[in-house]
Amino acid sequence: MIRSDVERTLDFYVRMCSLSVTAESLAGLGLLLAGGGICPATGERLLSPDTVRVVKTIMLTCGMYDGSGTFAVQVGIPSKSGVGGGILSVVDRRMGIGIFGPALDGKGNSVAGERVLRHLSQQLHLHIFDTDSQTD
């Protein structure tokens, strides 16, 4: 339940939906989350460990709209898609991934982005529950 002014909340939401990002900036944000909230360039803590854990959990369970459950089983990488075709993904302690593909499926997720992430997950053993994912 939202407990703030509706107009202010909608204004904030529209502003967040209107941000211009690149695949590189999405990957950079993913890398920040993959590193536990510590900026890889400066070593400065930007996000608390609790915040990082909550964000990655929500990404895994809800980040791909109504396709989140299937995506979690098949790909297993915490990800957040946007209706502009971007996907931000986090591989804990390893990497951030940023992808753009403008064609969307019926659930609002990038068709090409999902395919790329599925391929990377399988080939590099990136699934969060893959026993090989903990080895380098």
Regions found by a protein language model. Give the residues of each.
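Active-site-proximal helix/loop microenvironment
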Residues: 1-41
